[in-house]
Curated annotation (Swiss-Prot):
Molecular function as annotated in GO: small GTPase binding
Annotated stretches, region: Disordered: 161-281, 330-727, 741-782, 835-913, 969-993, 1037-1141
Name of the molecule in the record: Rab11 family-interacting protein 1
Keywords: Cytoplasmic vesicle, Endosome, Membrane, Phosphoprotein, Protein transport, Transport
Subcellular location, record wording: Recycling endosome; Cytoplasmic vesicle
Source organism of the structure: Homo sapiens (Human)
Stretches with biased composition (Low complexity): 588-612
GO cellular component: cytosol; intracellular membrane-bounded organelle; phagocytic vesicle membrane; recycling endosome
């Protein structure tokens, strides 16, 4: 019982006690009334009408000891009332066996006087006197301790507690009969009153004599103050349970649903989460308390005193004047926050949902993203979580990073954070759509800053990237708006994609639109599919592609085969995409996690791979009918461009016939992803190359892609966080919603790569064979790609292709087997040869970026025509040089291929390039389904291809040196080292690399425009010079950054090596000097120079040389010459755009024109190394494939080593593992997270200190005012029985 010293009204000792506690200690000198001078003495304590009797001290010799207490209710001692009411009477009696008890003496104490004189407590001896009117005798003394107490209950409370006390004997009898003890608490006891006993003080010792005699159980009841009032607490607590309603705020539900619906909401949801944790903690606590209490009350009728454990009772209950504080409730609330399941409120569920999406982004959302659009969801989560927790934010950016490379990862993580923050900021004020638009414009502008030509291309976010990607070219702005609308429509899908990111293919679709700005506007309506994909329906995605892009994508495959006789492989490819696409559908659902894990690195490669397939098909088609296929291809490309909006997944994808690819691509990616898990790394490289090839062939798309790529680059360059995303984001940039899809597509691409890669490989090989002598090199590219894919397919197609293009294939196999690097170089070689065509595409893309989109189609046609007939745009004049280049690459890769063969290869490769363009178009249309999935990876690869494009130029120059490239492992190590270096020089290197990449890109573009001849050469020279400048400017940073880029794209070192080699080789044809400038110091290195040597010098060149090296393989010498010329020319035309693109990593990737490069890959064993390096990111899949071709066990070993490298960089966690949420975080993000948690802990510690101080102060006050509360009585007072 809380006793207060001061009544609050009086001062000092002038306070009115409400109770007096009388403890009868002992007596002495009593008269003997029993036998032998003994007496059986007991004392009766009475105040007013209340009496208590002590126990009988039997046979005491005149000095009984009782030490029993009784508590009496006092009238106001300060009021003038009858003295008897405030008089304490102590009577000592002898218990007689017969008759009345004998009187031994009596003492009376005036409590008023005692209180006035002695204050609160007094222990003294009182002399026993005789009854009034009798003669006084010596009766002895009694020692009594009298303590005045104040119970602060209000009068009404006290009255309630005392109300039913019987005042008359009959009432007492009734109470006895009923078993009621006055002492025991009455049923009407108020919530606050501990017990109905008059003695409410904490001591409660002098409650009952009768109780003792009659019922110890009752005494216990009376002693436990709160036992009798089970409802008391529930009563006081009940009101608090109402806050529960607060839990059901529309905002809470809205944020939960909105989170699913769109990123803005997801971020708001995360905000809600954060709010919940802070401000909502109270609500939660209350809610939880409410929930808990209601639950407890439900279980234990209003909860009784047990509610003490409940947060509610503790939070709001004042028990006996003691307040229960919310400290524990808060803790409970926090606990509930962490485990929302405990709270039944929707808010609790929502919170749970939020947590799973944010923290369990890693676990729950990540699982979905892993399955569907890990990256997007990561990103979205990161955005939403940025406010709530770094965890989620980091995860989004981190996930792509691990896939891309440590280097890219770190760069991307910052970028992602920035993008996320920016996105969040824009999203908060604006609606999801407006925010998307603003993000598009804002981020695109940022990207523009990086690469002026492609403002829209920069995907601030994956969504933004998608939207931006649409806008890359002249059409980019319009498509971007359309894409924005579409993204708005599909924002929920995109958001869910980003948040849940279940549908990679979804994003891929969005990405595809970006890929083909011209046709984007029309295809965008098809992009509605992204929503369906949001449900992770890869096939729905395909449906959308066919519906929205049926004319483009489906027609592309159809047209391809019909219009391109050589497209048997193309149709095969188309079928492959379908197969792969369907398989991907199955696999996408089955192995979403694989997608997420492989998505980043493999996605890009896969995209490339698909293009490669198309290229090999093109080779065949070209061999059969180059001119016609080219036109159909161009048409297909155009159509494909139209569908691209739907595909949106990848400019390359659209270039490759994205129309049919978008959904299939996703499926393919899924299937391939699984297949690729083993051979993914190798496959990825080859796929990347392939993708690049198709990309180049379809200049028109590339045009759009180019702007888009710059966007990607911008995104990529802008922030490392975004950069991580960029691999996908790049893809997204190109393809509207690629980012999330990028991840999914990446994962899916892997699967697709495996399947599509294998199919395409076989087809490409067939095409290469059809292409004949020129294809030896060119075919070698397809064969390498095939090798990669076949490796995916367990070498089935590879064997065929190997047989067909045994020279190239075996060499590439040897290269891969002997050196994963060599294999990569070969792939690069293939790319190099194809990049020539791609270069035209890039050149056109650059031009388109500058506002020459038409040129891109023209370049495309020209490319094809120039393949057939050295035309103005493509390889016309450079046709022989291109072929020659290819041959030199082949010669380097394969000594056996003669220069003359290279010459013939020149023409044929050029044709093949044209045919490839046509086939690529057709294949793209068909592959566009899985390309849609690959599209994101393609975009990613395009990012790589942006880097590669310059690399392609460099490759054209240094292709021969590809064979000397280090092994895959070495490259990986180098890339990792470079990545580390780049991370150190991250920003500078990035800028340098991007710039160089842009220049390289420009160079690459000119390559495609070989047909332009001298003008192209001049452009390329200009670009080469620019590249040289860029590379020279940032040779160190560039080396680091290119290495980083290469690491990111797996092409850095390879293309470097190739760059030097190509540079030298190009000098042989006509662009040696020009190529050298492109190489940026790589030119001087001999063709045999290992990629590693060039790596430091021409980082962008490295990247692009890898790509170019493939085209070089196909058109090694010729390509070099033509590349030099056309690159010069294209450099002049697209120099600004390319520089911009290069400034942005995405543009560099765009420059990557994998398709051309892909074919020559097998042509050059040396190139394989460069390619592998180039594929560092993609390379892993390529290396795995190449190794597989030569040696399945070797391929497995390579894959394992590469996987181990990845795992070393990032330990893999199961999505169900709580650590998964943090596994994707970058170092910086982890640091931020730790700092944030530290801050939170410090805040909590501060709160704890405050509470502790409060408790200490409270204790001090209690000790000062009511020390008896804390005092443990030395003598355990017995309760005197009530009479």
């Amino acid at each position: 019982m809380s006793l207060m010293v001061s009544a609050g009204r009086g001062l000092g000792a002038v306070w009115s006690p409400t109770h007096v506690q009388v403890t009868v200690l002992q007596a002495r000198g009593l008269r003997a009334k029993g036998p032998g001078g003994t007496s059986d003495a007991y004392a009766v304590i009475q105040v007013g009408k209340e009496k208590y009797a002590t126990s009988v001290s039997e046979r005491s010799l005149g000095a009984p000891v009782w030490r029993e207490e009784a508590t009496f209710e006092l009238p106001s001692l300060l009021s003038s009332g009858p003295a008897a009411a405030a008089t304490l009477q102590l009577t000592v009696l002898h218990r007689a066996l017969l008759g009345l008890d004998k009187f031994l003496g009596r003492a009376e104490v005036d409590l008023r006087d005692l209180h006035r004189d002695q204050g609160r407590r007094k222990t003294q001896w009182y002399k026993l006197k005789s009854k009034p009117g009798k003669k006084d005798k010596e009766r002895g003394e009694i020692e009594v301790d009298i303590q005045f107490m104040r119970n602060n209950m209000t009068a009404s409370m006290f009255d309630l507690s005392m109300k039913d006390k019987s005042r008359n004997p009959f009432g007492k009898l009734k109470d006895k009969i009923k078993g009621k003890n006055k002492d025991s608490g009455s049923d009407t006891a108020s919530a606050i009153i501990p017990s109905t006993t008059p003695s409410v003080d904490s001591d409660d010792e002098s409650v009952v004599k009768d109780k003792k005699k009659k019922s110890k159980i009752k005494t216990l009841l009376s002693k436990s103050n709160l036992q009798k009032t089970p409802l008391s607490q529930s009563m006081s607590v009940l009101p608090t349970s109402k806050p529960e309603k607060v839990l059901l705020r529309p905002g809470d539900f809205q944020s939960q649903w909105d989170e699913d619906d769109n990123e803005d909401e997801s971020s708001s949801a995360s905000d809600v989460m954060s709010h919940k944790r802070t401000a909502s903690t109270d609500l939660k606590q209350l809610n939880q308390v409410n929930f808990t209490l209601p639950k407890k009350e439900g279980l234990s009728f209003l909860g009784g005193l047990r509610s003490k454990n409940d947060v509610l009772s503790r939070s709001n209950v004042c028990i006996n004047g003691n307040h229960v504080y919310l400290e524990q409730p808060e803790a409970k609330g926090e606990i509930k926050d962490s485990s929302p399941s405990s709270s039944p409120s929707p808010k609790g569920f929502r919170k749970k949902h939020l947590f799973s999406s944010t923290e369990n982004l890693a676990a729950g959302s990540w699982k979905e993203p892993a399955e569907g659009g890990g990256l997007s969801s990561d990103r979205q989560l990161s955005e939403s979580s940025t406010k709530d927790s770094l965890k989620s934010m980091t995860l989004p950016s981190y996930r792509p990073a691990p896939l891309v490379s440590g280097d890219l990862r770190e760069n991307m993580a910052p970028a992602n954070s920035e993008a996320t923050k920016e996105a969040k900021e824009s999203k908060k004020p604006e609606s999801r759509r407006s925010s998307l638009l603003s993000l598009m414009t804002g981020k695109k502008d940022v990207a523009k800053g990086s690469e002026g030509e492609n403002p829209l291309t920069v995907p601030g976010r994956e969504k933004e990237g998608m939207l931006m990607g649409v806008k890359p070219g002249e059409d980019a702005s319009g498509p971007a708006e359309d894409l924005v609308r579409r993204s708005e429509k599909d924002t929920a899908a995109v958001v869910s994609r980003q948040g849940s990111s279940l549908n990679l293919f979804e994003d891929v679709q969005i990405t595809e639109p970006e890929a083909e700005p011209e046709s984007k506007s029309e295809p965008r309506p098809p992009i509605s599919s992204p929503r369906a994909p949001q449900t992770r329906a890869v096939k729905p995605r395909l449906e959308v592609s066919p519906e929205a892009q049926p004319t483009a994508r489906l027609p592309s495959p159809t047209d391809s085969p019909s219009s391109l006789p050589p497209l048997p492989s193309s149709s095969g490819q188309a079928s492959v995409p379908s197969e792969l696409g369907h398989g991907a559908d199955t696999q996408s659902s089955e192995s979403p996690s694989v997608f997420s894990s492989l998505s980043s690195p493999i996605a890009a490669p896969i995209s490339t791979s698909t293009p490669i397939e198309s290229w090999p098909l093109v080779d065949r088609g070209q061999a059969k009918s180059e001119g016609p296929p080219l036109l159909p291809k161009a048409e297909l490309q155009t159509e494909s461009l139209t569908p691209v909006p739907n595909s949106g997944s990848s400019a390359l994808g659209s270039l490759f016939k994205q129309p049919s690819f978008p959904a299939n691509k996703g499926t393919e990616d899924s299937l391939m992803g699984r297949t690729r898990e083993t051979g993914t790394e190798k496959n990825t490289s080859s796929l990347e190359l392939e993708e690049s090839l198709p990309e180049q062939p379809e200049t028109g798309r590339q045009e759009e892609e180019l702007p888009r790529f710059p966007c990607k680059k911008q995104d990529y360059s802008p922030s490392s966080g975004e950069a991580q995303e960029v691999p996908f984001a790049l893809s997204l940039s190109s393809d509207g919603a690629v980012s999330p899809v990028g991840e999914l597509a990446a994962g899916g691409d892997r699967d697709l790569e495996s399947q599509a890669g294998s199919l395409v490989e076989s087809k490409a090989r067939d095409a290469a064979e059809e292409v004949a002598p020129p294809l030896p090199m060119g075919a070698s590219v397809p064969s390498i790609d095939s090798m990669m894919r076949k490796l995916e397919e367990m070498g089935l197609n590879l064997r065929k292709d190997q047989k067909k293009t045994k020279k190239r294939v075996s060499f590439s196999e040897q290269l891969f087997t002997e050196e994963a690097v060599a294999g990569a170089a070969l792939l690069v070689e293939g790319h190099s040869s194809c990049p020539q065509e791609l270069n035209p595409a890039w050149s056109v893309a650059g031009n388109a970026s500058d506002g020459e989109p038409p040129e891109s189609p023209h370049a495309e046609d020209s490319e094809r025509e120039s393949v057939t007939t050295p035309g103005p745009a493509t390889c016309g004049a450079p046709a022989s040089p291109a072929d020659h280049l290819l041959l030199p690459s082949q010669e380097e890769s394969f000594s056996e291929v003669p220069m003359s063969e290279a010459s013939s290869a020149k023409d044929t490769p050029l044709f093949r390039m044209e045919g490839e363009d046509a086939l690529v178009t057709q294949y793209q249309s068909k592959a566009s389904d899985h390309e849609g999935l690959l599209s994101d990876p393609l975009s990613d690869l395009q990012l790589v291809s942006d880097f590669k494009s310059p690399i392609m130029a460099d490759l054209n120059l240094s292709l021969p040196s590809i064979p000397e490239v280090a092994s895959d492992d070495e490259r990986i190590d180098q890339v990792e080292d470079d990545g580390d270096q780049v991370e150190d020089d991250g920003e500078t290197a990035k800028s340098s690399t991007l710039d160089i990449g842009a220049l390289s890109l420009g160079l690459v573009v000119p390559c495609p425009e070989r047909g332009k001849g001298p003008s192209g050469e001049a452009d390329r020279l200009v670009l080469g010079e620019g590249l040289c400048d860029f590379r020279l400017q940032a040779p160190q940073a560039s080396v680091t950054a290119p290495s980083e880029q290469t690491t990111e794209f797996g092409i850095h070192k390879p293309h470097l090596g190739k760059s030097s080699s190509l540079d030298k080789q190009l000098p042989g044809p006509s662009g040696g000097e020009e190529e050298k400038p492109m190489g940026n110091g790589s030119p001087s290195p001999p063709p045999g120079t290992s990629l590693d040597n060039p790596v430091p010098s021409p980082s962008p060149s490295e990247i692009f040389p890898v790509t170019h090296s493939f085209p070089s393989s196909a058109h090694s010498d010729t390509h070099h010459t033509s590349t030099a010329e056309s690159q010069k020319k294209a450099t002049a035309e697209g120099s600004a755009g390319r520089v911009e693109n290069f400034g942005k990593r995405k543009p560099l990737l765009q420059a990557w024109v994998s398709p051309s490069e892909t074919h020559p890959v097998s042509a050059q064993p040396g190139a394989g190394t460069g390619s592998a390096k180039h594929r560092l990111h993609p390379v892993k899949p390529m290396n795995a494939m190449a190794t597989k071709v030569a040696n399945c066990s070797l391929g497995t070993a390579t894959i394992i080593s590469e996987n181990l490298n990845n795992e070393v960089m990032m330990k893999k966690y199961s999505p169900s593992d709580p650590a998964f949420a943090y596994a994707q975080l970058t170092h910086d993000e982890l640091i931020q997270l730790v700092l944030k948690q530290k801050e939170t802990i410090s805040k909590k510690e501060f709160q704890v200190r405050e509470l502790e101080d409060y408790i200490d102060n409270l204790l001090v006050r209690v000790m000062e005012e009511t020390p008896n509360i804390l005092r443990i009585p030395t003598q355990v007072g017995k309760k005197a029985g009530k009479m």
